[in-house]
Regions:
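Eukaryote-biased feature marking scaffold/signaling PDZ-domain proteins and nuclear chromatin regulators
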Residues: 99-101, 110, 204, 215, ...
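Conserved beta-strand elements of beta-rich interaction domains across eukaryotes
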Residues: 109-113, 119-122, 225-228, 234-236, ...
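Amphipathic alpha-helical segments that line or abut small-molecule/effector binding pockets
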Residues: 207, 268-282
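ATP-binding glycine-rich phosphate-binding loop
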Residues: 26-184, 197-206, 210-215
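Helical subdomain adjoining the active site within ATP-dependent kinase catalytic cores
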Residues: 2-63, 92-93, 306, 313, ...
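Conserved structural core of kinase catalytic domains
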Residues: 144-201, 216-274
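Catalytic-loop of the protein kinase fold
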Residues: 281-314, 319-320
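Protein kinase-like catalytic domain
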Residues: 213, 281, 285-288, 372, ...
């Protein structure tokens, strides 16, 4: 016991000489107080972190709900057997950022995958995986029994029109949905298969995975009900994402830039990733299934493969133009800030009518170029930096209604891509 006391005394008071301790007796008390205050604050942060994790990470609840519905024959999917009966889907790290959308890294069929599943608001976050889900929850309620395949086709077409707009390409997308719905490849769509694919369509990211090219988004690998798996999480371009969520807002911009330069890819690789991001913006503007808006433009959403090809890390905040217009049109407002969809899709406010307009103020390209200024200018070759900075400044000033800047938008985007390709072409980085 005496040794323990001696050790504690050394730890707490050894930084101060005996002479100083004698001259400043109050310093001991202050030092002890600061040590215990540090212990208290540290314990509180650990508690908050654990509480936040318990709220955000509820994969066991997700799996319990899905497997309960599968065993009852309500849903189907290519993943169900491995997930619920054979237990061949391994859940690894929790990557969720909101409680309602569960995201995990995992392993399936020897591949690294990302597992995604929605949790209804009514589910108890403390529910255990061995407990049956609440019976009063209405899940997978459409289509109803007796719905013909023709009716389901029309139902799907109406849904896609409402979310993507009335486009001539939609019948082809409906055919793609019905082909996907036939999970067991028996050339017919059962009620369980129809319920499952309908539930998947309600997930914004799944709809985007169908609508956008696989080149810039993770490939869909399998599903069960409205749970689905995609290719593994791409490498992140924002190294502050590795920090705990509570500490991320505290990261100073200067430190953020320094982290990007020290830990990020070499500049030519960053240029290649940026070209992919610009091509993705081009696809959003001229896609086969209408126009899409990026409504949370951050480096946290910019990912890349092992070969430094751009991959969108998160499609949750990419929204179809029709959905954004429907949300904003006629919405009551006092200021433009009241006319915001997601984080940064903002429309003008008609102050006379006190209603939001449907067109966005800032196009995708202007928001992406703001990102690229911080991403590309640090470390850029000296002979390129001035011209690159000028073009990025021009790009960030793109304004006016998003639907009215198409020609200028295309010209600025083309100039930027050409400038970057010219720098890295005929090198190993291309």
């Amino acid at each position: 016991m005496r040794r323990l006391r001696r050790l504690a005394h050394l730890v707490l008071f050894c930084p101060f000489s005996k002479g100083l301790q004698g001259r400043l007796p109050g310093l001991r008390v202050k030092y002890v107080f600061l040590v215990w205050l540090g212990v208290f604050v540290g314990s509180w942060l650990v508690y908050v972190r654990y509480s936040s994790y318990a709220e955000l990470c509820r994969g066991h609840v997700c799996q319990a709900v899905i497997c309960d519905q599968y065993r009852k024959g309500i849903i189907s999917g290519s993943l169900c057997q491995d997930l619920c009966n054979l237990h061949k889907v391994e859940w690894r790290t929790c990557l969720s950022s909101v409680p309602g959308q569960q995201v995990y890294s995992g392993l399936w069929q020897g591949k690294e995958v990302t597992i995604k599943c929605g949790i209804e608001e009514g589910l108890d976050p403390k529910a255990r995986s061995d407990l049956a889900p609440r019976q009063e929850l209405v899940l997978f309620d459409k289509p109803t029994r007796g719905t013909s395949i023709k009716e389901f086709r029309e139902m799907t077409l109406s849904f896609l029109k409402a979310n993507l707009g009335d486009l001539p390409s939609l019948p082809a997308l409906v055919g793609q949905v019905l082909l996907m719905a036939d999970f067991n490849k028996d050339s017919r769509v059962s009620l369980a298969e129809a319920k499952s694919v309908w539930a998947l369509l309600q997930r914004n990211e799944f709809l985007l995975l169908l609508s956008l090219q696989e080149e810039h988004a993770s490939r869909l690998l399998g599903s069960c009900g409205d749970l689905y798996v995609t290719e593994g999480v791409p490498h992140g371009s924002w190294h502050g994402a590795a920090l705990p969520p509570l500490l991320r807002p505290l990261l100073p911009p200067a430190l953020h830039t320094a982290l990007q330069q020290w830990l990020g890819p070499a500049w030519p690789w960053r240029a290649k990733i940026a070209i992919g991001l610009l091509e993705f913006v081009e696809e959003l503007f001229h896609g086969a299934y209408g126009t899409f808006y990026m409504c949370e433009t951050t480096l946290a959403n910019v990912g890349y493969t092992a070969k430094y090809d751009f991959k969108m890390a998160d499609l949750q905040q990419v929204a179809p133009e029709a959905a954004v217009r429907r949300f904003l049109q006629g919405r009551h407002c006092e200021h433009s800030a009241d006319c915001t969809y997601g984080r940064d899709c903002r429309a003008p406010c008609d102050k006379l009518m006190r209603q939001c307009k449907g067109d966005l103020i800032q196009p995708n390209l202007a928001k992406v170029c703001e990102l690229l200024r911080d991403y590309l200018l640090p470390g850029a070759p000296i002979e390129l930096r001035e011209e690159l900075g000028r073009q990025l400044r021009t790009c960030t000033t793109l304004s006016g209604l998003a639907s009215q800047v198409e020609a200028h938008h295309a010209l600025v985007l083309s100039h930027l891509k050409t400038l970057l390709w010219k720098e890295i072409s005929n090198t190993k980085y291309s």
